[in-house]
């Protein structure tokens, strides 16, 4: 499959931003440890957001019916613990905001919900598509405390960034990079040079 880089994620996001904002998360499924299906509805339209965090196949997309059949995704009789946690906090909630982190393969979906004491709570579902470090993380936006994640990361795996419930969420370390707009502009300029006839 094509390399799912930050530009691909940004293009996918820009194309679907109008659907994301205000969409209600109706159903959450986790067929395997690394496959997720989020059934959403907005403006009378239903879609299924597919998230794959396999190290060699990480990507996200809205599934067409034919593609859903080809993937042969079967919901287990007993859902994983993380799936049940996501259902507890997010099923029935609407996406209040969404964004892609600049120059990263990270998609964030924000939710405004209510806790057990009927207090407003702002949550973030963070989808990190970064090869062997790919993960899905749910955290509280007010405190940045992680509620749960698809894969816990302990100190033995990462000295810089541990990921598990109860710890503070921090973004992965970033390397110096060029903004999306500059990359796109540079590619356009290269194309112009290649196809400009000599005078």
Language-model regions, residue ranges each:
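Conserved small/polar residues in nucleotide/adenosyl-binding loops
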Residues: 195-199
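Acidic, proline/glycine-enriched N-terminal capping motif
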Residues: 1-184
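Conserved phosphate/oxyanion-binding catalytic-loop motifs
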Residues: 183-194
